[in-house]
Amino acid sequence: MVLCFPLLLLLLVLWGPVCPLHAWPKRLTKAHWFEIQHIQPSPLQCNRAMSGINNYTQHCKHQNTFLHDSFQNVAAVCDLLSIVCKNRRHNCHQSSKPVNMTDCRLISGKYPQCRYSAAAQYKFFIVACDPPQKSDPRYKLVPVHLDSIL
């Protein structure tokens, strides 16, 4: 039993800093994390663009879509009619027009040497929106999750 406590303590220390793949960095609001992950008004090469995300999470994200639009324009989608999200919540909203976007997919590498392929697209998108937190931009609702691409 004496040996178990130090092993348990070591396990907790090693396990503590691990960030689940679906979580957002806690020092950011969900809206700010959405902006970092998905808003890119001017297209960047995927390897460069994804390094900004991967540096927060300390792993190679397998796939990510960048919307080539402003946060303001994407936040305006939150004012449109709400629809059901993939998770069955009713806080999703579909864009009224397609936008240019880039889909980045991991092809090789291990963090921090992640390598991505890029596919340019022109599609509609669906975002989940929530009320803003204190440090978020002042909108009635802000985008917090890219639910799907149509």
Swiss-Prot record:
Keywords: Antibiotic, Antimicrobial, Disulfide bond, Endonuclease, Glycoprotein, Hydrolase, Lysosome, Nuclease, Secreted, Signal. Disulfide bonds join 46-104, 60-114, 78-129, 85-92. Residues 1-23 form the signal peptide. It comes from the Eukaryota. The active site is at residues 38, 145. Ribonuclease which shows a preference for the pyrimidines uridine and cytosine. Has potent antibacterial activity against a range of Gram-positive and Gram-negative bacteria, including P.aeruginosa, A.baumanii, M.luteus, S.aureus, E.faecalis, E.faecium, S.saprophyticus and E.coli. Causes loss of bacterial membrane integrity, and also promotes agglutination of Gram-negative bacteria. Probably contributes to urinary tract sterility. Bactericidal activity is independent of RNase activity. This is Ribonuclease K6.
